[in-house]
């Protein structure tokens, strides 16, 4: 398997943010991806903008940065440029895990052969994927380091979901979940928590078996919550909902970077209990009670976030992301994105008002 591990300095970081494209009049999703991509041609560095499965989704990719502080400074300006491109194309930009009311099955699939094939092979689950995530990439030196980082991140996927929860509504209904995206994404094959790999070679053998079986064409068809990405030389965290506030994006990126760098400090944990924690975080967000492996106790998600940040602060100082990691504390002490969306609905009485709030807050 071709890899680029070690091609970049270790623990450089970049993100991919998936944005909703919104009709300014109806506030519904609008399939304007081709118009936005055309508007961005020559305006932004090649590869910055990309399509995804849904034609109402715009993926925005940052370059790799030496520090999360650099990423944090770049994100607002990049979002502003992309927002202007969307507006020129007749769309508004929204960052949240799911649209409050647009029916998922009505969203057209993009014309990319990859996604046409996915639609053909999966059927209904593919049509439900009108969801929007934050992906964090952290460069690692080699395959073994990638496997260890995946393991360390996997045990903390529930906490990432709790911190990022930003999708309470689905097709006009309050799901009573903090992250409906986490459940909808689980409809597709090879999603959810990653298998536990003892070595890089075991990961390679697993992918090769799936290729020989005709299940996948390459490892990028394994859509786990966190995975090695050898073509980029990174580990990729895929669990968080898209964040309305770019400051929260930076905070989650810092947490991911620190965990990847400190991976050897975290032993693999019982996947069944991690799955249970993931459900609790999906349902309750930061109000969840999570099983704490180290203390064999139940701990509030907010407290778990504070304890993890405290443990990682020495690593953050070495990486230069202490301020951004402390942003996780700010998230843990405030309302989630899901809470804020519900508050807007309670105050305004309209899901269109929720869309307006999200569009205005997507800074």
Curated annotation (Swiss-Prot):
Any one GO MF term held by the record is: ATP binding
Instruction: Give the superkingdom in one word.
Output: Bacteria
Q: Does the keyword Ligase apply?
A: yes
What this protein catalyses is: L-cysteine + L-glutamate + ATP = gamma-L-glutamyl-L-cysteine + ADP + phosphate + H(+)
Enzyme Commission identifier(s): 6.3.2.2
**Key word Ligase present:** yes
User: What family does this chain come from, according to its entry?
Assistant: Belongs to the glutamate--cysteine ligase type 2 family. YbdK subfamily.
Q: What does this protein do?
A: ATP-dependent carboxylate-amine ligase which exhibits weak glutamate--cysteine ligase activity.
Protein known as? Putative glutamate--cysteine ligase 2-3
Q: Which organism is it from?
A: Rubrobacter xylanophilus (strain DSM 9941 / JCM 11954 / NBRC 16129 / PRD-1)
């Amino acid at each position: 398997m071709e890899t680029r591990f070690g091609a970049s300095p270790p623990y450089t970081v970049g993100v991919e943010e998936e944005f909703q494209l919104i009709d300014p009049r109806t506030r519904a999703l609008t399939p304007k991806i081709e118009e936005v991509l055309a508007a961005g041609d020559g305006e932004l560095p090649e590869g910055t903008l990309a399509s995804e499965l849904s034609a109402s989704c715009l993926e925005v990719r940052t370059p790799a940065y030496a520090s999360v502080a650099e990423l944090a400074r770049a994100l607002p300006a990049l979002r502003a440029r992309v927002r202007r491109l969307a507006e020129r194309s007749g769309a508004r930009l929204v960052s949240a895990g799911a649209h409050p009311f647009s029916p998922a099955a009505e969203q057209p699939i993009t014309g990319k052969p990859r996604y046409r094939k996915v639609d053909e092979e999966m059927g209904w689950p593919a049509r439900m994927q009108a969801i929007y995530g934050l992906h964090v990439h952290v460069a690692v030196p080699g395959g073994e380091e990638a496997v260890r980082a995946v393991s360390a991140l996997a045990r903390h996927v529930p906490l990432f979901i709790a911190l990022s929860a930003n999708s309470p509504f689905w097709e006009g209904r309050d799901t009573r979940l903090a992250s409906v995206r986490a459940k909808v994404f689980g409809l597709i094959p090879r999603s959810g928590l990653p298998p536990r790999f003892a070595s890089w070679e075991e990961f390679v053998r697993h992918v090769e078996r799936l290729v020989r079986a005709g299940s996948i064409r390459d490892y990028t068809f394994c859509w786990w919550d966190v995975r090695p990405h050898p073509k980029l030389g990174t580990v990729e965290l895929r669990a968080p909902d898209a964040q309305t506030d770019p400051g929260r994006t930076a905070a989650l990126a810092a947490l991911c970077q620190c965990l990847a760098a400190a991976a050897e400090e975290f032993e693999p944990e019982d996947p069944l209990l991690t799955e249970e924690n993931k459900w609790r975080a999906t349902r309750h967000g930061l109000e969840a009670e999570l099983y704490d492996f180290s203390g064999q106790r139940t701990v509030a998600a907010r407290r778990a976030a504070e304890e993890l940040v405290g443990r990682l602060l020495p690593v953050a100082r070495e990486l230069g992301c202490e301020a951004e990691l402390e942003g996780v504390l700010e998230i843990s002490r405030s309302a989630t994105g899901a809470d804020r969306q519900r508050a807007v609905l309670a105050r305004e009485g309209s899901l269109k008002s929720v869309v307006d709030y999200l569009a205005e807050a997507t800074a």
